[in-house]
């Protein structure tokens, strides 16, 4: 006897436009980290991706181009919280850290816990088995530096 589990399975909530923007930015940063292609070429490639038209375009542009433009500064900001050299990070972890660091520094309208959670979810989706824990720890420590008042108020 079989049972229909279609109703028992919870339907995944629709992705928000910002989540799609983060996913696409992460994918673009991944490509850029591996190939160092011109950001315009990376963006053009992503425009053909499924769901691009449903992404928050302004947020995507800010994340992709901002993280590439400020890669050195953002990397310097989170490097003190790494337990290994930046070169040993997986490209997905590094891209997630760049997205998260950029949002922590520049998107102060987004609560730091949301920024960290979104980076963790990106890493769970695209990264290795335990990579999300690492990204969580690094961004949590970075948040205490760049959003000290907000972190202190929430703890």
Curated annotation (Swiss-Prot):
Disulfide bonds, paired cysteine numbers: none
Cellular component, GO annotation: cytosol
Domain of life of the organism encoding this protein: Bacteria
This protein's UniProt keywords: RNA-binding, Transcription, Transcription antitermination, Transcription regulation
Short name of one Pfam family: NusB
GO molecular function: RNA binding
PANTHER family in alphabetical order: ANTITERMINATION NUSB DOMAIN-CONTAINING PROTEIN, N UTILIZATION SUBSTANCE PROTEIN B-RELATED
HAMAP family the record matches: NusB (MF_00073)
Its job: Involved in transcription antitermination. Required for transcription of ribosomal RNA (rRNA) genes. Binds specifically to the boxA antiterminator sequence of the ribosomal RNA (rrn) operons.
UniProt similarity note: Belongs to the NusB family.
Protein known as: Transcription antitermination protein NusB
Taxonomic lineage of the native organism: Bacteria, Pseudomonadati, Pseudomonadota, Betaproteobacteria, Burkholderiales
């Amino acid at each position: 006897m079989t049972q229909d589990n279609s109703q028992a399975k919870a339907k995944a909530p629709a992705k928000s436009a910002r989540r799609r923007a983060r996913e696409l930015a992460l994918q673009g940063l991944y490509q850029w980290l591996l190939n160092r292609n011109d950001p315009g070429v990376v963006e053009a490639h992503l425009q053909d991706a499924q769901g691009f038209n449903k992404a928050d375009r302004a947020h995507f542009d800010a994340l992709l181009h901002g993280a590439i433009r400020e890669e050195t500064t953002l990397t310097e900001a989170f490097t003190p919280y790494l337990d290994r050299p930046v070169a040993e990070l997986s490209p997905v972890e590094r891209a997630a850290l760049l997205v998260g660091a950029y949002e922590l520094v520049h998107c102060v309208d987004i609560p730091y816990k949301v920024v960290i959670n979104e980076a963790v979810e990106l890493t769970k989706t695209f990264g290795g088995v335990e990579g999300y824990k690492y990204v969580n720890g690094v961004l949590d420590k970075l948040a205490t530096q760049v959003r000290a008042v907000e972190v202190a108020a929430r703890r």
